[in-house]
Amino acid sequence: MRFEGIMNDIMDFRNLSEDEAHDLMEMIMDGEMGDVQIAALLTALAMKGETVDEITGFARAMRERAVKVKIPESMRVVDACGTGGDRFKSYNVSTAAAIIAAAAGVKVAKHGNRAVTGSCGGADILEAAGVNIELGPEAACRSLETLGIAFMFAPLFHRATARVAPVRRELGFKTVFNILGPLTSPASAEVQLLGVFDPYLVGPVAEVLRNLGVKRAMVVHGFDGNMNPAMDEISTVGPTLVGFLEDDEIGIKRLMPPDFGVDVGQLQHLKAASTVDGNLRMFMDVLAGLDDTPGRKSRLDIALANAGALIYLAEMEDTLEGGTEAARETVESGAALRLMEDFASFTQNL
């Protein structure tokens, strides 16, 4: 496969086959492309728009080469991850939701990275909370078995992620790697809550998950109260577009905050802080269940709605509203905050 030929095809707006995309990702992972070539490729793909076949091929290659976390066959794990790069840049909702869901009994294998375009990614917030994020596959599996949660730092498990990280930072805009991160769980999670930065990705990404063998999933994009695309999370300030995947069938629905059992909140309260320390304060307030101000209540409610979806996907509750109620009870009992403290202590001693 010649790089020049592939680039000419992409710039002529010809879509790649799944196999071509697979082989192209192998070239990246094998170090056959320089930084300038990678930057040109990512830019051209972003301008053309990536297809389901292309994303599937890229993800399949990354999954094949990933350092695997060997999960016991009897354990059903759930992954909670967003693409990042959303317009609003909300605080670390999916990470808070993962902790709450794990405290409620869901086995959560969270796969993530540092922030690329924002101030604080999932890896950044967990590290700030005291978690050792650089665990290998055996230690991650031990964390999952002992605590019910593990964090897998993407660059340690994916050569491609580490290879393109400097290029992505320099480019500064969303690329296919924003989409690929949540699709390439080293734990091969068959259940997933995946937030996307653009509502037009909801259906295609659900198709990719199906192609990759995921059994049950929700792909979500949240809007603000004026129907503007806003966040790669379930929204509590406006509608959420959801792609439900179950039994190889995909259904697209629009849900409102009451469908998740929460009140309509205020968008301005969900915005990420400008520093890691500021985000950490928000994050810990949520896990502690603080809701004594409008801002704290809004941040807690969105975490509960997203945690509730994880509980629902894990089939611990029959409805999304029931999942949110279970998440609320978990936080009110103090279990979420205790798990966060245990997670930090456990991983530092591995």
From Swiss-Prot:
Coiled coil: none annotated. Anthranilate 2 binds at R168. Homodimer. Binds 2 magnesium ions per monomer. PANTHER family: ANTHRANILATE PHOSPHORIBOSYLTRANSFERASE (PTHR43285:SF2). Keywords: Amino-acid biosynthesis, Aromatic amino acid biosynthesis, Glycosyltransferase, Magnesium, Metal-binding, Transferase, Tryptophan biosynthesis. This is Anthranilate phosphoribosyltransferase. It comes from Methanothermobacter marburgensis (strain ATCC BAA-927 / DSM 2133 / JCM 14651 / NBRC 100331 / OCM 82 / Marburg) (Methanobacterium thermoautotrophicum). Gene3D superfamilies: Nucleoside phosphorylase/phosphoribosyltransferase catalytic domain (3.40.1030.10), Transferase, Pyrimidine Nucleoside Phosphorylase, Chain C (1.20.970.10). NCBIfam families: trpD. Its EC number is 2.4.2.18. Its cofactor is Mg(2+). Anthranilate 1 binds at G82, N113. Pathway: Amino-acid biosynthesis; L-tryptophan biosynthesis; L-tryptophan from chorismate: step 2/5.
